[in-house]
Amino acid sequence: MKNQFAVLLVALVLLQLFSQSEAFWSTLLSIGKSLLGKRGLRNFDLEQMDDTYEPELSEADLRYLQDLLR
């Protein structure tokens, strides 16, 4: 009985691992298709990346980045 329970637990863990990795890869594949497709490249907005870049950095920001990268 203990062996059957252990086999069941291992099977459930492996099933969860497979299903989660399948969802991850399918999401990654759909993102790649949307970016590389004809419509995806035409509708890709480069201005949405502007929020991640701040051209004006203060001295405190530069010092913090230098300390962070050491």
Swiss-Prot record:
Tissue occurrence: Expressed by the venom gland.
UniProt signal peptide: 1-23
A cellular-component GO term for this protein: extracellular region
Top-rank taxon: Eukaryota
Function: Antimicrobial peptide with potent activity against bacteria S.aureus (MIC=4.7 uM) and E.coli (MIC=31.5 uM), and pathogenic yeasts C.albicans (MIC=25 uM) and C.glabrata (MIC=12.5 uM). Is not very effective against P.aeruginosa (MIC=150 and >300 uM). Also provokes moderate hemolysis on human erythrocytes (HC(50)=10.5 uM).
Subcellular localization(s) per the UniProt record: Secreted; Target cell membrane
Protein name: Antimicrobial peptide VpCT1
Swiss-Prot/TrEMBL keywords: Amidation, Antibiotic, Antimicrobial, Cleavage on pair of basic residues, Cytolysis, Fungicide, Membrane, Secreted, Signal, Target cell membrane, Target membrane
Keyword Membrane attached: yes
Gene Ontology BP terms: defense response to bacterium; defense response to fungus; killing of cells of another organism
Removed propeptide positions: 37-70
